[in-house]
Amino acid sequence: MEIKDLQDYVAIVNDWPKKGIVFKDITPLMNDGEAYRFATDKIVEYAKELKIDIIVGPEARGFIIGCPVAYALGIGFAPVRKPGKLPRETIEMEYDLEYGTNKLSMHSDAIKPGQRVLITDDLLATGGTIEATIKLVEELGGIVAGCAFLIELKELEGHKKLNGYDRLILMKL
């Protein structure tokens, strides 16, 4: 398998979750053991190069990408969630959506100062989620060593919010 083959495992769903949206569904990739392992292994290789201490992923698909990477590396995983979903003390970060704002939260003890962090997610779109996640990690004293995505939606230019941050993008659609 090659990276270019991964696109065969992304289903395009028109008008979901609402009219006018073209959704990139990664469940076919997850359903295929060879493709899922291949994508995970590429991110593991990237994380090894960066000497990562911990993986951070926003809910929910960031968990799907990040947890197997953390497991393969024998390191921890720290979830980033919507407010009110984590049971202990958290920090929060607001970010902009196309129409309004949203918030993400993280346990306030999830990252130790100086830890090298890899942020994982399935998709880089506008960059709002990744930007807020970076701010959460840095507020806790973590070093964002890199960001890894299965897919970047090129036309939404989310990569502009990652200036100065190393990144791995397996597919640009």
UniProtKB/Swiss-Prot annotation:
BP terms from Gene Ontology: adenine salvage; AMP salvage; purine ribonucleoside salvage
Alphabetical list of InterPro entries matching this protein: Ade_phspho_trans (IPR005764), PRibTrfase_dom (IPR000836), PRTase-like (IPR029057), UPRTase/APRTase (IPR050054)
Keywords, ordered alphabetically: Cytoplasm, Glycosyltransferase, Purine salvage, Transferase
GO molecular function: adenine binding; adenine phosphoribosyltransferase activity; AMP binding
EC class name: transferase
Protein's cellular compartments: Cytoplasm
The organism's place on the tree of life at top rank: Bacteria
Pathway where this protein functions: Purine metabolism; AMP biosynthesis via salvage pathway; AMP from adenine: step 1/1
UniProt EC number: 2.4.2.7
Keyword Transferase applies: yes
SUPFAM superfamilies xrefs: PRTase-like (SSF53271)
Catalytic activity as recorded in UniProt: AMP + diphosphate = 5-phospho-alpha-D-ribose 1-diphosphate + adenine
Cellular component, GO annotation: cytoplasm
Principal place of residence: cytoplasm
Assigned protein family: Belongs to the purine/pyrimidine phosphoribosyltransferase family.
Subunit structure: Homodimer.
UniProt cross-references to HAMAP family, sorted A to Z: Aden_phosphoribosyltr
Functional description taken from the UniProt entry: Catalyzes a salvage reaction resulting in the formation of AMP, that is energically less costly than de novo synthesis.
Matches recorded under PANTHER family: ADENINE PHOSPHORIBOSYLTRANSFERASE
Name of this chain's protein: Adenine phosphoribosyltransferase
Origin species: Listeria monocytogenes serovar 1/2a (strain ATCC BAA-679 / EGD-e)
Gene name of the record: apt
